[in-house]
Amino acid sequence: MTSLLLFGAGGLFDFDATLPLMALQVVLLTFILNALFFRPVGRVVEEREVYVTTSRAEAKQKLAEAEKLELELKEQLKSARIAAQQLIQEAEKDSEQLYREALAIANADANAAREKARREIDAQRDSALSQLKGDAEKLGDLIVNRLLAAK
């Protein structure tokens, strides 16, 4: 019974014009699908693949450029920091030098004023001593004269 269903008229393996017609339909449908669907889809897939490949290449190139710029900027920042440190050190040296010069000038002025005051005091002392000597001599002479006059 199964052999009748398989090989009989209208069975699965009926070799009349149906099988070649079906084969022709499959081949024709394959060509139509290939022309209308598979080729355009294949082209879109290839275009997308090319786009992705070029995008990745551009991204890698931009990443390399960004890394290069980052290194350059780090070097510039490093040199700027070094230059700033040098400027700060020079400014500190200059301010220290100015401080020392101002201190030396102030000390010199103070020493000069002290020396001038000492000289004035010495002059006034000498003047006072000489005046006292003169007054003492006058007073001594006056006492001697009064003592002699009193005798």
From Swiss-Prot:
Keywords: ATP synthesis, CF(0), Hydrogen ion transport, Ion transport, Membrane, Thylakoid, Transmembrane, Transmembrane helix, Transport
InterPro entries recorded: ATP_synth_b, ATP_synth_B-like_membr_sf, ATP_synth_b/b'su_bac/chlpt, ATP_synthase_B_chain
Transmembrane segments: 18-38
GO cellular component: plasma membrane-derived thylakoid membrane; proton-transporting ATP synthase complex
Primary residence: membrane
Coiled coil (residue ranges): none
Top-rank lineage group of the source organism: Bacteria
Bilayer disposition of the protein: Single-pass membrane protein
Compartment annotation: Cellular thylakoid membrane
A GO MF term: proton-transporting ATPase activity, rotational mechanism
Family: Belongs to the ATPase B chain family.
The protein's role, per its UniProt record: F(1)F(0) ATP synthase produces ATP from ADP in the presence of a proton or sodium gradient. F-type ATPases consist of two structural domains, F(1) containing the extramembraneous catalytic core and F(0) containing the membrane proton channel, linked together by a central stalk and a peripheral stalk. During catalysis, ATP synthesis in the catalytic domain of F(1) is coupled via a rotary mechanism of the central stalk subunits to proton translocation.
Subunit structure: F-type ATPases have 2 components, F(1) - the catalytic core - and F(0) - the membrane proton channel. F(1) has five subunits: alpha(3), beta(3), gamma(1), delta(1), epsilon(1). F(0) has four main subunits: a(1), b(1), b'(1) and c(10-14). The alpha and beta chains form an alternating ring which encloses part of the gamma chain. F(1) is attached to F(0) by a central stalk formed by the gamma and epsilon chains, while a peripheral stalk is formed by the delta, b and b' chains.
NCBIfam families per record: PRK07353.1 (NF005607)
Protein name in the entry: ATP synthase subunit b'
Organism encoding this protein: Prochlorococcus marinus (strain MIT 9313)
Lineage, opening ranks: Bacteria, Bacillati, Cyanobacteriota, Cyanophyceae, Synechococcales
